[in-house]
């Protein structure tokens, strides 16, 4: 597995992966070219995915699939159904991306099992988790009740303040807060993980809950409870954060701006109990 050999094993920071059920994975993904890998059903490789997952259980934490108008096109939920078979065969959780319909939000979450993860959970209309009347869709509530994990995955088209406000007003908070940084959104609106955390802080989520959603809750979702913990005997990995006060302009994928009074800032990283910086490692000369 090239990614393991050339990236994971050479990285000082720990990297875990979800294995895409498409043989090609995500490809042709840029601001000018976008091809949905899940639309081409000939690329679905369930038998190969099971073999690779079984051979790399130390670094592969689950199975991944993307469905929606932009990622699966006319294939609809078929890639999701195949990915669920792989997840069942390997005993691993599934992470499912959702974008524009079809399929609908309801069709996707109705298929997910306890411990499976829906990412881009607070996406805007169309295919938002809430109704136009400001309520949580019944299928979404049922999914949470049976143990489906709702992950933010803030990228270029997958998070809106309106959806977040509506869901949180109904007491429906994300289980995990993550970014989805790629070529389309690294220059905005997502920018980075701490900006995503800051948005939830300024939307009214308690700081302790924001931090839990990016640490201990993530360890639980990964089924790796040793992650996201500072207890005695834990791995000794941590990010040092501070909260700055001021006036900060945040933007979502719809173009809505939120002026917040706080900003979470990364002050440093600790790996295995020691301070770490990417420019101090063996790849510094390439930076």
Language-model-detected regions and their locations in the chain:
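Solvent-exposed alpha-helices and their adjacent loops that cap or buttress functional pockets
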Residues: 8-10, 53-57, 87, 109-112, ...
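Active-site core of metal-dependent hydrolases
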Residues: 65-166, 170-187
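C-terminal cap of metal-dependent C-N hydrolases
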Residues: 236-286
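Divalent metal-coordination and catalytic microenvironments
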Residues: 3, 21, 63, 118, ...
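Residue-level recognition of short, solvent-exposed, well-ordered loop/turn junctions
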Residues: 113, 231-235, 271
């Amino acid at each position: 597995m090239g990614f393991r050999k050339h990236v994971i094993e050479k990285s000082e920071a720990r990297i875990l992966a979800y294995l895409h059920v498409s043989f090609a994975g995500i490809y042709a993904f840029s601001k000018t070219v976008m091809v949905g890998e899940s639309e081409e059903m000939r690329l679905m490789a369930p038998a190969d995915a099971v073999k690779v997952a079984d051979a790399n259980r130390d670094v592969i934490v689950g199975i991944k699939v993307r469905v929606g108008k932009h990622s699966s096109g006319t294939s609809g939920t078929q890639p999701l159904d195949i990915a669920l078979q792989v997840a069942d065969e390997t005993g691993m959780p599934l992470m499912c991306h959702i974008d524009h319909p079809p399929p609908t939000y309801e069709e996707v979450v109705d298929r997910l099992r306890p411990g499976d993860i829906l990412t881009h959970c607070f996406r805007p209309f169309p295919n938002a988790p809430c109704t136009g009347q400001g309520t949580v869709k019944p299928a979404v509530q049922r999914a949470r009740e049976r143990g489906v994990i709702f992950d933010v995955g803030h990228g270029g088209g997958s998070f809106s303040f309106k959806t977040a406000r509506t869901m949180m007003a109904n007491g429906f908070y994300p289980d995990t807060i993550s970014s989805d940084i790629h070529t389309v959104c690294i220059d905005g609106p997502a920018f980075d993980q701490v900006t995503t955390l800051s948005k939830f802080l300024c939307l009214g989520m308690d700081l302790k809950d924001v931090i839990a959603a990016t640490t201990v809750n993530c360890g639980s979702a990964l089924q790796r409870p040793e992650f996201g913990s500072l207890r005695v005997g834990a791995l000794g990995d941590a990010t040092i954060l501070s909260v700055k006060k001021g006036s900060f302009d945040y933007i979502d994928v719809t173009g809505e701006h939120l002026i917040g009074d706080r900003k979470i800032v990364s002050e440093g990283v600790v790996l295995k109990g020691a301070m770490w910086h990417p420019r101090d490692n063996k790849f510094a000369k390439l930076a």
